[in-house]
């Protein structure tokens, strides 16, 4: 019994030492984890700050977000058909992201995504005997036809960009149907009420693009 009592303090001390050592190791691991998360958070904040300043940089935006390829051609036909230059660029960005060879699943072609039947109709209206469907991939012809069509729609809808853009995307027939069904007049501006989700998003995107183009290309 005495031997057992003599041994107890020693066992207790060893147990206490072991407990303290484990506690110390846990503290070290906890501190390491905290240090790791602090470093990670700092890195995220630094990257977020850099990203913000890069994305706000106008040169970066012009080059990567809101380019103005074919600017001379856009300006020429926009002036010729009395359409806002930046509106034409905004439509091209939304339609094809300035890819000359873009083709939609529905068959729309080129920079301004003109359907073959629409292209043929435009050719008749402007008396262009040189039209062929393959030429819709030609930069000059595509921008010429698309800009003329925008001008035609803006005239038809009395300068209302929302209705003209909705017609460019969904067809003028649908727009007239919506105007009658929902009692829209020629002053309609609330694109959020457009019933087709694709057209609603399209009009929103083009108008947002135009705001950026107006800011970047004054």
Language-model features and meaning:
Residues 2-5, 14, 46, 50, ...:
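Generic secretory/membrane-interface signal
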Residues 53-218:
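Catalytic glycan-binding domains that act on GlcNAc-containing polysaccharides
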Residues 5-7, 18, 39, 57, ...:
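Intrinsic disorder/low-complexity segments enriched in polar/charged and small flexible residues
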Residues 38-56:
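Hydrophobic membrane-insertion alpha-helices, especially the h-region
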Residues 1-35:
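N-terminal Lys/Arg-rich, disordered targeting/topogenic segments
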């Amino acid at each position: 019994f005495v031997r057992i009592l003599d041994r107890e303090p020693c066992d207790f001390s060893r147990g206490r030492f072991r407990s303290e050592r484990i506690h110390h190791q846990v503290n070290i691991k906890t501190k390491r984890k905290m240090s790791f998360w602090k470093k990670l958070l700092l890195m995220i904040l630094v990257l977020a700050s850099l990203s913000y300043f890069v994305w706000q940089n106008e040169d970066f935006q012009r080059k990567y977000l809101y380019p103005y390829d074919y600017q001379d051609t856009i300006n020429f036909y926009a002036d010729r058909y009395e359409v806002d230059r930046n509106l034409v660029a905004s439509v091209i960005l939304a339609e094809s992201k300035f890819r000359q060879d873009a083709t939609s699943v529905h068959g729309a072609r080129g920079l301004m995504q003109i359907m073959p039947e629409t292209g043929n109709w435009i050719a008749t209206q402007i008396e262009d005997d040189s039209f062929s469907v393959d030429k819709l991939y030609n930069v000059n012809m595509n921008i010429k036809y698309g800009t003329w069509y925008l001008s035609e729609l803006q005239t038809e809808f009395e300068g209302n960009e929302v209705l003209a853009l909705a017609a460019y995307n969904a067809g003028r027939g649908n727009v007239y149907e919506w105007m009658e069904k929902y009692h829209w007049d020629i002053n309609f501006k609330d694109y959020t009420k457009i019933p087709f989700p694709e057209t609603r998003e399209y009009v929103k995107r083009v108008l947002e693009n135009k705001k950026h183009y107006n800011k970047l290309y004054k």
